[in-house]
């Protein structure tokens, strides 16, 4: 069996991928936090909507609350999609790193 030393470029690529993987993990955690925060806002607006009655205030308040709720729900959906994209990229990088590591062990 022939042993091949990893080239400097291979090492740089491995380090770059490893750093990207770690960055993606941090971004995923950040996005998950944003999802939780926005879900809490949706719940808050639901509760607030229960307390505001048409006779208590202007009807426009109900419309504003509904609009805000919709905006927060849209944000939650956007963050869920972004999180899925980041997770996919992280998994792809993990697979690449594994292959690169196995190639070096076999080489």
Curated annotation (Swiss-Prot):
A single cellular component GO annotation: cytosol
Localization per Swiss-Prot or TrEMBL: Cytoplasm
One Pfam family cited in the UniProt record for this chain: DUF496
Record keywords: Coiled coil, Cytoplasm
Highest taxon listed in the record's lineage: Bacteria
Coiled-coil regions listed: 14-41
Signal peptide: none
Functional note: Pole-localizer protein involved in the regulation of several cellular processes.
Family indicated by similarity: Belongs to the pole-localizer TmaR family.
Protein name per its UniProtKB record: Pole-localizer protein TmaR
Species, as recorded: Klebsiella pneumoniae subsp. pneumoniae (strain ATCC 700721 / MGH 78578)
Gene that specifies this protein: tmaR
């Amino acid at each position: 069996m022939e042993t091949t030393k990893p080239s400097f470029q291979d090492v740089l690529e491995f380090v770059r991928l490893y750093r990207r993987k770690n960055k993606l993990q941090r971004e995923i955690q950040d996005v998950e936090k944003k999802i939780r925060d926005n879900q809490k806002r949706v719940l808050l607006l639901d509760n607030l909507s229960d307390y505001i009655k048409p006779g208590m205030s202007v009807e426009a308040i109900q419309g504003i609350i509904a609009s805000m709720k919709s905006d927060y729900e849209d944000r939650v959906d956007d963050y869920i999609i972004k999180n899925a994209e980041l997770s996919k990229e992280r998994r792809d990088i993990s697979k690449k790193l594994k292959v690169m590591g196995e190639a070096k062990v076999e080489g």
